[in-house]
Amino acid sequence: AGSAELGVGRLAATALPVLGMSLAFSMLFCSVLSDHDPVATAYLASQGVSTARLGVVRSVGALAGILGTWLWPRLQARLGTLPGASVALWLFVLCLAPVPATLAWSPSPMLLLVSLSRPFLWAFDLAMVSVLQELVPARWRGKAAGLQAVACQLFELAISALAVALSGSERFPALAGASVGALMLSACTFSASATLQKLRSPPSDAIPVAEYGRA
């Protein structure tokens, strides 16, 4: 029993940073600051933003995905997987951080900032694929991706419930503020987990990635 508990403890210590990174990724779904979010779309429409303008913003967001796929390999090559992922995530969050304050006078800055943030979001999405490939053993990747997807749905459900509680266009700035708070927490969680992964000194009994399943 003692050796089994030791094995579980070693496994938890080894996998904890990756769990934190997956949790950070999932937190990104706890936000309405997106060019395709229905709550944000309804708010922008209530503020007089035309359907054509919203369509243009969504098209720009789609094109930003191409830029994100160009950006991530360069960040990864220059900084490394975890530092590059952290940079992409923080740039995404910093682009959206001013949104709640700007809503007091116009919805236009929100459209601009959301569009500017998209390449970094796409880059971070690709970064998480790299993280799972590099830090999770092949036999566990499917389970890890599945658990991450479930967590994403739970955070999306949480922001939807908050949107119901804060319904009405006059309360959208508060909802945007909560979204920025969730994004900031995501970036902090990822950075802390990446730092833990980098600084964690592998003891003599550390479990190599390829041997997780034997613990």
Which positions does each model-derived feature cover?
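Juxtamembrane intracellular "pre-TM" segments in multi-pass secondary transporters
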Residues: 1-24, 46, 212-215
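Intrinsic disorder in cytosolic terminal tails and internal cytosolic loops
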Residues: 195-215
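Alpha-helical transmembrane segments of multi-pass secondary-active solute transporters
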Residues: 54, 84-85, 144, 174-179
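A membrane-interface helix-boundary motif in multi-pass transporters
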Residues: 163-187
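C-terminal ends and interior cores of transmembrane alpha-helices
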Residues: 90-105
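Substrate-agnostic recognition of the 12-TM MFS/MFS-like secondary transporter fold
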Residues: 1, 26-38, 57-76, 88, ...
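Cytoplasmic membrane-interface "Motif A"-like loop-to-helix N-cap segments
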Residues: 77-92, 173
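Short amphipathic helix-loop junctions that connect adjacent transmembrane helices
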Residues: 37-54
